[in-house]
Amino acid sequence: MKTLITGGTGFVGSHVCRQQMAAGHAVRLLVRDIEKASAYYRRLGEGIPELVIGDVTDSASVKTALEDCDSVVHAAAGTPMQTGSTERLFRVNVDGVKHVVASALERSIDRIVCISSITAIFNSDGAKVTATAPLTQSSLPYGQSKVEAEVYLRALQAQGAPISIVYPGGVIGPDDPGFSDSFKALKHRMENGFRIFGDGGMQYIDVRDLAAFVCSLVQSGGSGRFLMPGVYCTWSELADIIETVSGCQLQRIPAQGWKLRLVGRMTDLLRHVRTIDSPISAETMRYATLWPNIANTGELPTRGLALRSANDTFADAIAWMVEVGHLDASQCPKLSVRD
């Protein structure tokens, strides 16, 4: 089997690539910078996938990349912080999905897996967040882009297209080729104070568990929607976990949700006039203060998979951050650099 992966130099896509190669499958990545991608996989020492130059916003390069592939994982996506503009955000998250999926269907590829986001079906009532839940009509650009892509994918699914959609929560774990927003937020909390949003919480999925589930979907094919929000922790529980696994003594800051949502909106306004490298935004504050406990797909045990504990995930994530220099070792006395 040969799998095309978009976003293969991103956090999720790189782990899917590594697991597919470890299982003996051929992998091709659509990348914007071949030298950068090659250097990353060379450092891992696990083999270098086939690399082709292109971008998901360019349909011609997508069509070329899909030649002789029999499966595709679309993991390329953008966030407001990464893309820098709403226009670019929609080009990546909406046009990119359309280019990849339409081109795959034109080639009669019958194993198509798309990584979406829980935000597309977000509801502060967790019981209402299911695989059949209606789409959320977000007033925020990121949510709007994910919903627009979902409308397209669901219409194709209704016509019988072989598309599997996966909805992860916050993705965390070791070995990020870049420095994703989840890590920026974690670093900020460890160094600048950990805000406790009342009784709220968040769900985190270990990137390795998410990749394993995606690879299982590539193997099985078919069509469906699968929730993978991960392990739920209240903010107080998460602070306890971070202190337990790292030895870092966090400064815990009680915070009211409505105030944080206001700060998020103000930060977004400031981004129109200056560059702000911060995980704070209207969208992130909404999710941080209103996130419920959402059930994971029931497919995990039938596929022989189980989620890691939050302790294991954050221990490995923080150890990796120390290893690559995102955190100083003195901040995490219980952790040593991984072998």
Stretches found by the model and what they are:
Residues 213-279, 301, 308-339:
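Mid/C-terminal beta-alpha module of Rossmann-like enzyme folds, strongest
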Residues 45, 49-95, 103:
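NAD(P)H-binding glycine-rich loop region in Rossmannoid oxidoreductase-like domains
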Residues 185-205, 209, 213:
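A conserved pocket-lining segment of Rossmann-fold NAD(P)-dependent short-chain dehydrogenase/reductase
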Residues 3-25:
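N-terminal Rossmann NAD(P)H-binding glycine-rich loop of SDR-like oxidoreductase domains
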Residues 86-87, 92-142:
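Conserved Rossmann-fold NAD(P)-dependent oxidoreductase catalytic core, especially the SDR/UDP-sugar
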Residues 81, 118-127, 171-180:
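Conserved catalytic-site region of short-chain dehydrogenase/reductase
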Residues 90-94, 138-150, 170, 183, ...:
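Short-chain dehydrogenase/reductase
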Residues 116, 151-174:
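Conserved beta-loop-beta element that borders a ligand/cofactor-binding pocket
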